[in-house]
């Protein structure tokens, strides 16, 4: 058990969760922007 590996570092599952949420948020923003923009123009 080497504690020096995890000291001062963010856990991998937390990083993956944040990256996943950010990717979903970006996709949602792109879809919402294209939908509202194209929908209102049409």
Curated annotation (Swiss-Prot):
Topology of the protein relative to the lipid bilayer: Single-pass membrane protein
Record keywords, A-Z: Chloroplast, Membrane, Photosynthesis, Photosystem II, Plastid, Reaction center, Thylakoid, Transmembrane, Transmembrane helix
TM regions (residue ranges): 10-30
Any Pfam family hit: PsbJ
Chief site of localization: plastid
Function in brief: This protein is a component of the reaction center of photosystem II. One of the components of the core complex of photosystem II (PSII). PSII is a light-driven water:plastoquinone oxidoreductase that uses light energy to abstract electrons from H(2)O, generating O(2) and a proton gradient subsequently used for ATP formation. It consists of a core antenna complex that captures photons, and an electron transfer chain that converts photonic excitation into a charge separation.
PANTHER family the record matches: PHOTOSYSTEM II REACTION CENTER PROTEIN J (PTHR34812:SF3)
Homology family: Belongs to the PsbJ family.
Annotated protein name in UniProt: Photosystem II reaction center protein J
Organism: Euglena gracilis
């Amino acid at each position: 058990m080497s504690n020096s590996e995890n000291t001062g570092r963010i856990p991998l599952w937390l990083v993956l969760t944040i990256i996943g949420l950010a990717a979903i948020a970006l996709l949602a923003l792109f879809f919402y922007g294209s939908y509202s923009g194209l929908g209102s123009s049409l």
